[in-house]
Regions:
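Short beta-strand elements in bilobed, periplasmic/extracellular small-molecule ligand-binding domains
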Residues: 1-4, 57-62, 109-134, 138-155
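Extracytoplasmic ligand/sensor domains, especially the bilobed periplasmic-binding protein
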Residues: 22-120
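Extracellular/periplasmic periplasmic-binding protein-like sensory domains
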Residues: 131, 136-150, 158-161, 176-180, ...
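Structural motif
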Residues: 1-15, 71-74, 124-136, 159-167
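Solvent-exposed loop/turn segments at secondary-structure junctions
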Residues: 3-7, 29-33, 52-56, 70, ...
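Glycine-rich, aromatic-lined ligand/substrate-binding cores of catalytic
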Residues: 173
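Solvent-exposed, polar/charged alpha-helical surfaces in well-ordered, non-transmembrane soluble domains
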Residues: 7-15, 34, 38, 73-77, ...
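Short acidic/histidine-rich motifs immediately flanking catalytic phosphotransfer sites
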Residues: 16-23, 176-179
Length: 249
């Protein structure tokens, strides 16, 4: 079971419940899963959901997706091995974003990691340009450039003149305060939008390590130039193929 809105979901659910069904597979998102559970609470029908929210599972509801806490643990463990220490995190300002923040901070505390800078965006109408500027602290670094140019203009040395020539070709002054950017968005279209815009505000994927959730584990991600050097959580491809072969048999 999975549909685009609550009304269609409930309509289809009541329809299938009239049949003699043994199991319900779906939906994907935890809010819809909770609706299905509520409607079927008086029926002994197991539910297998594709959500990654382990908080909703119980003795009748099985969660089949990758657990968020496992994704974050694996991604950060791998990142530590690559000697990445300073991270920016981009998440929606909602329950999902709060879960990501909580899991990252718990991992941070247990592993003595120093820097995680969180940027939250409005999940209902994200301003991708404004959020991308906030991630890179663009306005402050732009002001730093203007300040540095004024400072050099007061000097009369050849060295200052040479530096001025270089600075006037730039948009900002100063390095980013993170080495890696973790993007846990609600859907892949948001990931695509951010990856297209972030480089314009100095978050260059050739210099900054992009890190993502299992949401990125789609063929579409391979077509996004901004994500070419990124890595993301995913099921083991060999085990997945074994499962698919068994399922087809």
């Amino acid at each position: 079971i999975d549909t685009g809105d609550e009304e269609q979901l409930l309509s289809r659910l009541y329809s299938v419940l009239e049949d003699d069904i043994d199991i319900i597979i779906g939906p994907v998102f935890s809010d819809k899963v909770n609706q299905v559970r509520e409607v079927t609470k008086n029926k002994d029908i197991p539910i297998v959901a594709f959500s990654n929210n382990s908080k909703i599972q119980d003795n009748r509801l099985y969660v089949f997706g990758l657990k968020l806490e496992d994704e974050i643990k694996e991604l950060l463990t791998y990142s530590i091995k690559r000697n990445l220490k300073k991270y920016a995190v981009l998440v929606p300002r909602n329950e999902f974003g709060s879960r990501v923040e909580k899991e990252i901070k718990q991992f941070q505390s247990k592993n003595n990691l120093s820097t995680f800078i969180f940027t939250f965006y409005n999940p209902n109408s994200p301003d991708f340009y404004d959020v991308s500027k906030n991630v890179s602290n663009f306005e402050e670094r732009k002001a730093n450039l203007e300040k540095k140019i004024k400072q050099l203009e007061k000097e009369n040395s050849e060295k200052a003149k040479e530096e001025l020539k270089k600075l006037k070709k730039l948009d900002t002054y100063g390095e980013l305060n993170f080495e890696a950017l973790i993007i846990f968005a609600q859907n892949f279209q948001e990931v695509s939008n951010f990856s297209s815009i972030l480089p314009y505000y100095d978050v260059d994927p050739k210099k900054i390590q992009y890190i993502g959730s299992s949401l990125w584990a789609k063929n579409l991600s391979l077509k996004e130039p901004g994500l070419d050097n990124g890595y993301y959580a995913s099921l083991d491809i060999n085990n997945r193929r074994k499962f698919e072969d068994m399922y087809l048999e």
